[in-house]
Regions:
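Sec-dependent N-terminal signal peptides
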Residues: 4-13
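N-terminal signal peptide c-region/cleavage motif recognized by signal peptidases
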Residues: 14-18
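N- or domain-start disorder-to-order transition segments that initiate the globular core
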Residues: 19-43
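M16/MPP (pitrilysin/insulinase) zinc-metallopeptidase core fold and M16-derived inactive scaffolds
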Residues: 21-23, 48-113, 153, 288-303
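Short, solvent-exposed loop/turn elements at domain surfaces
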Residues: 35-36, 43-46, 56-59, 270-271, ...
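His/Glu-based metal-binding/catalytic segments typifying zinc-dependent metallopeptidases
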Residues: 39, 48-50, 234-290
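Charge-rich, well-structured scaffold segments of protease-associated domains
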Residues: 84-233, 250, 276, 300-301, ...
């Protein structure tokens, strides 16, 4: 019965809007810093840990090791094998999840107050003494091999991996987090231990907690949970400048629709142009059916069901990317229309009406992100990694509201680069050939 109560709490509990969230920074007796939002109305806490570096810390000849390691952390620890770990987690009505991406290894925990001490013990065993049993390694390797095979048959994944390789080259961002079939198959238990040592250290740790816990309680919890982790991990990779030469790369693939990815240089978080660019992106490709690209590519011409763009800000690279799918006989026209929109907005800018609609949506939708302990914990730990101040949620909408039409149109002129707009197309697009 307790696990069903937990599920109900997890699903329905929500905190106040962003501006009302009171965030405190605490430092444990052992020196571990964390951001905390106390909410004692429900006996439930979400804890988020993030270790900077992620799969980018794979050794060059061990690609896929960090991803495999993260997947195996819940497959047994100390005296519990894979089944025993899962059963104990179920008994405690806890959620413990591990994940990895190019920039971080993430640990997400949701727990009831009455079971918090035991959940932390279970989590600590996974972080400090994972078993990495060979049968679990073989089983998870098999799952990863299946995913790699499915990616090789997916036009979306082929497009993503082709574009990443072109943008980032030999940098870790340029290859799949999973590795290749060959590199994944060759990984050993020693490789997993090395990956854990490289990534899960206190010098790259960010922590947030939201819920029924005080600062004093959180400090003691963190020292007990994380105090035995290594002080330092492997050096982080150097930043990389994505290569956007302009032009088109076509990857022939038998599919009725061409998958199209496109992009150009981006804008870093901390650059003064970021907020005008953020609003400009909303107008260009982030605003659903009212966005310029949706209007021109879908509504006027029926070339796609949907097209979108995003500012992509990673730890070590920034870009501005978009995607769509179009039938092979229309893909060439879709690429042309996107280029034309890019040229037009760069030259002529956007309208006051477009600006106001974008700002209204962006400021109105922001509080909706703060809809539960776990989501807030993820937001807070992401803010720390990205270097935002602790009061950012209270002032973020002010930054959006302050963006003027002059700001947006200046950034459009200076930042939009039609000459560097680069396309990757997977399919058999009629009338479209590789130029790169």
């Amino acid at each position: 019965m307790i696990r069903f109560l937990f599920a109900a709490v997890f699903c329905v509990f929500a905190l106040p809007a962003a501006a009302e969230v009171k965030i405190a920074e605490i430092t444990s007796p052992g020196g571990i810093k964390a951001w905390l939002v106390e909410e004692h109305g429900i006996p439930f806490t979400a804890l988020e840990l993030r270790f900077r570096g992620g799969t980018s810390l794979d050794a060059p000849d061990k690609r896929g090791a960090v991803m495999l390691m993260a997947a195996l952390l819940e497959e047994g620890a100390d005296g519990l094998d894979s089944r025993g770990f899962a059963e104990r987690r179920e008994e405690l009505a806890a959620r413990i999840g591990f994940d990895a991406d190019a920039d971080a290894v993430t640990v997400s925990v949701q727990m009831l107050t009455e079971n918090r001490e035991e959940v932390v013990k279970l989590l600590k065993s996974a972080l400090t003494n994972p078993r990495f049993d060979q049968d679990a390694i073989d089983r998870v390797k098999g799952q990863i091999q299946s995913i790699i095979q499915s990616h090789a048959a997916s036009p979306d994944d082929i497009a993503r991996e082709t574009m990443d390789a072109a943008l980032y080259g030999d940098h870790p961002y340029g290859s799949s987090d999973l590795g290749t079939a060959e590199s994944a198959a060759a990984l050993t238990r020693d490789d997993l231990l090395a990956a854990r040592a490289a990534t899960m250290a206190r010098d790259r740790l960010y922590v947030s907690a939201v819920g029924d816990i005080t600062g004093e309680e959180l400090g003691k919890l963190l020292d007990g949970l994380l105090g035995d982790l290594p002080a330092t991990g492997a050096p982080l990779p150097a930043p990389v400048t994505p290569a956007f030469p302009g032009g088109v790369t076509v990857v022939p693939f038998d599919t009725p629709q061409s998958v199209i990815l496109f992009g150009q240089p981006g804008v870093p978080w901390k650059n003064p142009d970021y907020y005008p660019a953020y609003v400009l992106n909303q107008i260009l490709g982030g605003g659903g059916f009212t966005a310029r690209l949706m209007t021109e590519v879908r509504e006027k011409r029926g070339l796609t069901y949907g097209v979108s763009t995003n500012l992509v800000n990673m730890d070590l690279a920034d870009s501005w990317q978009g995607s769509l799918a179009s039938s092979n006989d229309k893909a060439g026209e879709a690429v042309k229309v996107i280029r034309d929109v890019w040229v037009d907005v760069a030259a002529k800018g956007v309208t006051e009406a477009e600006l106001e609609a974008a700002k209204t949506y962006m400021t109105g939708s922001y509080p909706l992100r703060f809809d539960g302990n776990d989501n807030i914990a993820r937001i807070l730990v992401g803010m720390q990694m990205d270097g935002f101040p602790i009061d950012y949620p209270a002032h973020r909408n002010d930054k959006i509201a302050a963006v003027t039409l002059e700001d947006v149109n200046r950034v459009a002129r200076e930042r939009m680069r039609p000459d560097r707009l680069t396309f990757t197309v997977v399919g058999h697009p009629v009338g479209l050939e590789s130029t790169n």
